[in-house]
Amino acid sequence: MIMIRFLSFILFFSYLNSGQDYIDYPHPFHPTSSKSGMVVSQNILSSDIGVEILDMGGNAVDAAVAVGFSLATTLPRAGNLGGGGFMLIYIKEKDEIFYIDYRSKSPKNASIEKLLGTKKIPDRNSKRWERVDYTYLASAVPGTVYGLLEAHKNFGRLELQEIMKPVIAQAEEGIVVSSDLSYVIGVTPQLKSDKESYSIYYKDDEPLEEFSIMRRPDLANTFKEISKNGIKGFYEGKIADKRVNAMNQNNGLITHED
């Protein structure tokens, strides 16, 4: 018992003299509190853009919209223009909660037979499912852009062009590839078989490494169309034409009607 107490005293004394907190509160895996607002996402570069929007006088919705678009650059598996999502918005002054559902939808001409090549749903172990896991048949009609812009239109404070400016700059100037993004690229070999994905996520025939620089000029151009023309900039015009052309060339189902 005396020895245990003596060791406890030594450990406690060492802790007091270490000059460091035993719990690293700023660490991402520990709770963090703030009195002036907070921006949280799965990538710090995107979160920084959210903070920038708040510093510009934007509200929480402005920041959320900017972060959502930014994640298409920094961590596309967590946020992307080709997907969808949901959003809850609380208006303190009215004590009201609004819900926006912008989940992706199936193309109008989709069917079990077109998707899986059979009229009956096959066993989940069937290789037929690879058709809707890794090919253009897996693509649903994207809702992300519609949902984010709908939130901004109804609840945002800043002009859309103000929100999109740092997002565009980030895609043009490039980002430092995170360990998360590098890992996901490395464990997704299907990216290598797609010409566009290969040109973005590979260098010298190898997946982009952590700390390397990734630039997205094409994505920046899409952001510019959205910034200039809003929803129509993504669901109509040249961006929509490119998307439909890609579908036609790769046996996808999304059409202009969708």
Report the location of each language-model feature.
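Sec-dependent signal peptide recognition
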Residues: 1-9
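Hydrophobic h-region of N-terminal signal peptides that target proteins for export
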Residues: 9-18
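Noncatalytic scaffold domains of N-terminal-nucleophile
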Residues: 20-48, 60-229, 234-236, 240-258
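Long, structured ligand/cofactor-binding scaffold of large enzymes
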Residues: 52-54
